[in-house]
């Protein structure tokens, strides 16, 4: 009975170990794009197609490399690491911004991590405030209930007045419509004779 229990645990561990091995075959896409642009050295900037060719020829990349490169280019444009010389979005020509992109990208990542940490810390501070508020909530709920009870008769009165108006207006319209029909019938009858 003891032998089958430890067997599934080692089977699960190699699956977890495989995931980090895959990205180790090549550097990050942002680093590869920077290397491709540096290698191109064209005045007009390097196109996405040339970047893709360089990355595929120099690195072991998966099937979805083109899509990853496109996404990475967009990210680098938004962070200001790349400058677009021609075109719009991920299509066009690109240059590295002033200074090496490789130096800037880790700094950008650190800033993002710091920003993420800062965003989490105010949330923690807000949680104890929420814990205090439930004592106030029942009073507020009681006030809301009173307001609703006061407001509800007003709402009930309004539809009654609307119905009364609609009935009054509808009656004369019917009477007016019936009269012209009678006249039209009288006019038509002499023509038939």
From Swiss-Prot:
Key words of the record: Chromosome, DNA condensation, DNA-binding, Nucleus
Entry's Gene Ontology molecular function annotations: double-stranded DNA binding; nucleosomal DNA binding; structural constituent of chromatin
Organ and tissue specificity: Erythroid cells.
GO CC annotation: nucleosome; nucleus
Compartment(s): Nucleus; Chromosome
Organism: Anser anser anser (Western greylag goose)
Pfam families: Linker_histone
Domain H15, first and last residues per copy: 25-98
Primary location recorded for the protein, binned into one broad class: nucleus
Family in the record: Belongs to the histone H1/H5 family.
A biological-process GO annotation: negative regulation of DNA recombination
UniProt-listed InterPro entries: H1/H5 (IPR005819), Histone_H1/H5_H15 (IPR005818), WH-like_DNA-bd_sf (IPR036388), WH_DNA-bd_sf (IPR036390)
Protein name (Swiss-Prot/TrEMBL): Histone H5
Function: Histone H5 performs the same function as H1, being necessary for the condensation of nucleosome chains into higher order structures, and replaces histone H1 in certain cells.
SMART domains from the UniProt entry: H15
Basic residues biased stretches: 13-24, 104-193
Biased segments, Pro residues type: 1-11
Region (Disordered): 1-29, 80-193
